[in-house]
Amino acid sequence: MSQYRTFTAQDAVEYARTFGGIDDPSTLVEAQEVGDGNLNLVFKIFDTTGVSRIVVKQALPYVRCVGESWPLTLDRARLEAQTLVAHYQHCPQHTVKIHHFDPELAVMVMEDLSDHNIWRGELIKGAWYPQAARQLGEYLAQTLFHTSDFYLHPHDKKAQVATFINPEMCEITEDLFFNDPYQIHERNSYPAEIEGDVAALRSDAQLKLAVAALKHRFFSHAEALLHGDIHSGSIFVADGRLKAIDAEFGYFGPIGFDVGTAIGNLLLNFCGLPGHLGIRDAAAAREQRLTDIQELWNTFAERFQVLATEKTRDAALRAPGYASEFLKKVWADAIGFCGTELIRRSVGLSHVADIDTIQDAEMRHECLRHAITLGKALIVIADRIESVEALIARVRQYS
């Protein structure tokens, strides 16, 4: 049995030689730490020709950006590996491949995606991958349908829910999405110039009631095995290709949470684009984001509907029209969760480069206000936004 230790670069090389599945392991000679996240060490392993061949990822026992004063369970590495393995089973074309996992060392070996780019960085530059939103919709439909009650036998579903209980990581989500932004808290981070906007969140009783309902759904609706953190920084893209990574927040929760988080990150980019591009380029890129949102939802809903028609095993859930009614509830959830993503990324602990890297301070503050205003509106009126076209109309209204 392995005993946990924090990997050095040389440890990562030796581990990749043993478990990387490379025909000639001796060609692996160097590791470079590339992780910019808060929770893990990530090493790219290079061969003698300087080509990156494999990735080694190890969970740390604390939140990196805070330090050892915020400890974290190492079991999240098991949950991430098992979530990605399950998602790969149902959607291999859009899920990173896990070659090996060691629960004692909290380390996994996975495919290298050096020929891809992180989607967030591409979106900030104004680069458009026309197929990416449809591919993300396909990933969400395949992974969420095949881990839901529509497809799984009830006994299997209940056993999987137990396997994927992830209380410590869920608590982080519960705090950062549903608690911190609506109270004075030391984890919150925002410029003093928007204090009035943030104070308005804390005093908005209608908003806080709607957020409470969303948190309750996050607590209690074990609908499918979520990725749990499906933002544009956890997605790699290349021409015609897309892969999801980083699933340590995976657990059985409301389907609308994954869908809403994905849409929310596209809207965060929408809000930040005027701070990165000229007027015409920003306007064009914003239209691309709205197209992305429409294609993401339409692909997800259409594919989920087809899968439900063809593969639903439960007799009651096969009732004509039920899948459509279920998707209406998923949509309403998604709009609300989307709003919480917009707000928590603007005023909470974890921000996004789409807005934080805007050089002009006044423009950055304006983009933050835009995200907060849009997020508030979506949370409060989620049940009145009945279609993706209505969502896009609302986004235009608040822009």
From Swiss-Prot:
Gene3D superfamilies: 3.90.1200.10, Phosphorylase Kinase, domain 1
Catalysed reactions listed for this entry: 5-(methylsulfanyl)-D-ribose + ATP = 5-(methylsulfanyl)-alpha-D-ribose 1-phosphate + ADP + H(+)
GO molecular function terms noted in the UniProt entry: ATP binding; S-methyl-5-thioribose kinase activity
EC number from the UniProt entry: 2.7.1.100
Residues reported to bind substrate: D229, R344
GO biological process: L-methionine salvage from methylthioadenosine
Enzyme class, spelled out: transferase
Binding-site residues, ATP: N40, K57, E111, D112, L113, D246, A247, E248
Pathway as given in its UniProt record: Amino-acid biosynthesis; L-methionine biosynthesis via salvage pathway; S-methyl-5-thio-alpha-D-ribose 1-phosphate from S-methyl-5'-thioadenosine (hydrolase route): step 2/2
UniProt feature coiled coil, ranges: none
Database matches in Pfam families: APH (PF01636)
UniProt xrefs under InterPro entries: Aminoglycoside_PTrfase (IPR002575), Kinase-like_dom_sf (IPR011009), Methylthioribose_kinase (IPR009212)
SUPFAM superfamilies: Protein kinase-like (PK-like)
Keyword line: Amino-acid biosynthesis, ATP-binding, Kinase, Methionine biosynthesis, Nucleotide-binding, Transferase
Known function: Catalyzes the phosphorylation of methylthioribose into methylthioribose-1-phosphate.
Family to which the UniProt record says this protein belongs: Belongs to the methylthioribose kinase family.
Subunit structure comment from the entry: Homodimer.
NCBIfam families: MTRK
Name the record gives this protein: Methylthioribose kinase
Native species: Citrobacter koseri (strain ATCC BAA-895 / CDC 4225-83 / SGSC4696)
Name of encoding gene: mtnK
